[in-house]
């Protein structure tokens, strides 16, 4: 009978999962000026960005240097941003996590009036040995339009049973 008390790789996978989860927790709980160092959680050629946009194409920031520049822009445009109601979900892959959360704060985009932005988000994190390889953010773009005082068209969905 084979020994199944410690399958090969089981302990290592759990340790890796916990290491990666700690990185995701740190990313999601980083606030204020500390956001200027969040790029340090990424691998050198890591990327992050917004996968739901008004254009239909993602905005992808590639590489630690560009992620650092993005942090400066983000702090200027979302000065008091915070994620809350954070729920982190592991997957069968110790290097992949999903996060469901809410976020809120001022939105200061040049050319638009100052607004207050609230939305519901999903994040996909792909990691490598405790560092983020790719972070994809998904949200309801209409909520951002509303926060910027941009009129949102209404879709008629006649007949939907609710």
Swiss-Prot record:
Supply the name of the protein: Phenazine biosynthesis protein PhzB1
Q: Does the keyword Hydrolase apply?
A: no
Please verify whether the record's keywords include Cell cycle. Answer: no
User: What pathway does the UniProt record associate with this protein?
Assistant: Antibiotic biosynthesis; phenazine biosynthesis
InterPro entries, alphabetically? Answer: NTF2-like_dom_sf, PhzA_PhzB
* The protein's assembly and partners: Homodimer.
Q: What upregulates it? A: Under control of LasR. In liquid cultures (aerobic), phz1 operon is induced by quinolone signal via 2-heptyl-3-hydroxy-4-quinolone (PQS). In biofilm (microaerobic), phz1 operon is not induced by PQS, because the biosynthesis of PQS by the monooxygenase PqsH requires molecular oxygen.
Q: Which organism is it from?
A: Pseudomonas aeruginosa (strain ATCC 15692 / DSM 22644 / CIP 104116 / JCM 14847 / LMG 12228 / 1C / PRS 101 / PAO1)
């Amino acid at each position: 009978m084979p020994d199944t008390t410690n399958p090969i790789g089981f302990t290592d996978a759990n340790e890796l999962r916990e290491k990666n989860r700690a990185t995701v927790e740190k990313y999601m709980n980083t606030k204020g000026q500390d956001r200027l160092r969040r790029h340090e959680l990424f691998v050198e050629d890591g990327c992050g960005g917004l996968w739901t946009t008004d254009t239909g194409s993602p905005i992808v920031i590639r590489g630690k240097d560009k992620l650092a520049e993005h942090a400066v822009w983000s702090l200027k445009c979302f000065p008091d941003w915070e994620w809350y109601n954070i729920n982190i979900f592991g997957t069968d892959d110790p290097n992949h996590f999903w996060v469901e959360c809410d976020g809120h704060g001022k939105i200061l985009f040049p050319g638009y009036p100052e607004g207050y932005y609230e939305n519901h988000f999903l994040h996909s994190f792909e990691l490598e040995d405790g560092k983020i390889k790719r972070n994809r953010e998904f949200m309801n773009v209409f909520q951002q339009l509303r926060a910027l005082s941009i009129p949102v068209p209404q879709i008629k969905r006649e007949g939907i049973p609710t």
